[in-house]
Amino acid sequence: MMSKSMSISVNGQSQVPPGFRFHPTEEELLQYYLRKKVNSIEIDLDVIRDVDLNKLEPWDIQEMCKIGTTPQNDWYFFSHKDKKYPTGTRTNRATAAGFWKATGRDKIIYSNGRRIGMRKTLVFYKGRAPHGQKSDWIMHEYRLDDNIISPEDVTVHEVVSIIGEASQDEGWVVCRIFKKKNLHKTLNSPVGGASLSGGGDTPKTTSSQIFNEDTLDQFLELMGRSCKEELNLDPFMKLPNLESPNSQAINNCHVSSPDTNHNIHVSNVVDTSFVTSWAALDRLVASQLNGPTSYSITAVNESHVGHDHLALPSVRSPYPSLNRSASYHAGLTQEYTPEMELWNTTTSSLSSSPGPFCHVSNGSG
């Protein structure tokens, strides 16, 4: 009794419990609803109405096939295919305002590996063929496909009987209509008028611009931090390795600090990350700005402008143990540049001094 009362339609709408939503699968539409319709078997909850597709427009079907009061995105109905010509096989899908046009190939629907039906996709065009205006209304038309029978399963008599019954009711189909989402609403977005593809590319461009701005901020912050490190470590600044034919590799370098007036032994103590960080910084600038590649020695030389006491020749210390010259072993791994040539020329001109660049004292000597 419950099922009979729930199948009653009032004001063109099926009476269902509140919150009821109808979302059957393709297999359920074919195996349960359409098969029962074809075989005239009562459906437990009759929420799919019979519709004459040639007399109703899509928006009329939308109003007629509502199920309850819950908002819907698709609508279902049964329809009996009307032949366009009495002796032909073409289906008449014209309405008063337009026509339904098939598109693409029919899709085979399977259940447990067995073919049970077909799905045809149609688009509604306003006007008359062949100059109709395409709309956003789409229809999926499902039909049963029971004629594929294995010869080993049934006899010839049974095959003829089944084919006869199928041809008698083959006109019934179950349909689902819905409106295609209009993605062209992006034309009204603040980013400006653009096509659908252009609207998809706009966020990428914006993200790229934001990424470049963030990278530039990181670059400036890194430059400021590196310069601050150099200012704090000026008394212990270690110049990059220079290539000189008169230099020999030594491991230790002694520097006198004017604040403590004591010998400070510097041997792999000063962290050289701030020196090598210039090379990473240069590579970052080159990759972001696509400019010519800079080298760490150029950046170091420019950062030392105004600090002449770091480039003075060795000064005699009042302590005899410190009166030793030091030099750096060739260790540059960058490519040869004109700046290096200028630096090497300066180094060669100072080769007659007791020691180049390493032994530094801020004492009055």
From Swiss-Prot:
Known DNA-binding region: 116-186
Any Pfam family hit: NAM
NAC domain: residues covered: 16-180
GO molecular function terms listed in the Swiss-Prot or TrEMBL record: DNA binding; DNA-binding transcription factor activity
Gene Ontology CC terms, in alphabetical order: nucleus
This protein's UniProt keywords: DNA-binding, Nucleus, Transcription, Transcription regulation
Superkingdom per UniProt: Eukaryota
Tissues/organs with expression: Expressed in various aboveground tissues undergoing thickening of the lignified secondary wall such as anthers, filaments of stamens, the base of carpels, styles, the boundaries between siliques and pedicels, the midrib of leaf veins, and inflorescence stems, specifically in interfascicular fibers (sclerenchyma), cells differentiating into vascular vessels, and xylary fibers (secondary xylem).
Record's function text: Transcription activator of genes involved in biosynthesis of secondary walls. Together with NST2 and NST3, required for the secondary cell wall thickening of sclerenchymatous fibers, secondary xylem (tracheary elements), and of the anther endocethium, which is necessary for anther dehiscence. May also regulate the secondary cell wall lignification of other tissues.
Name the record gives this protein: NAC domain-containing protein 43
Biological source species: Arabidopsis thaliana
Lineage: Eukaryota, Viridiplantae, Streptophyta, Embryophyta, Tracheophyta
Chain's gene name: NAC043
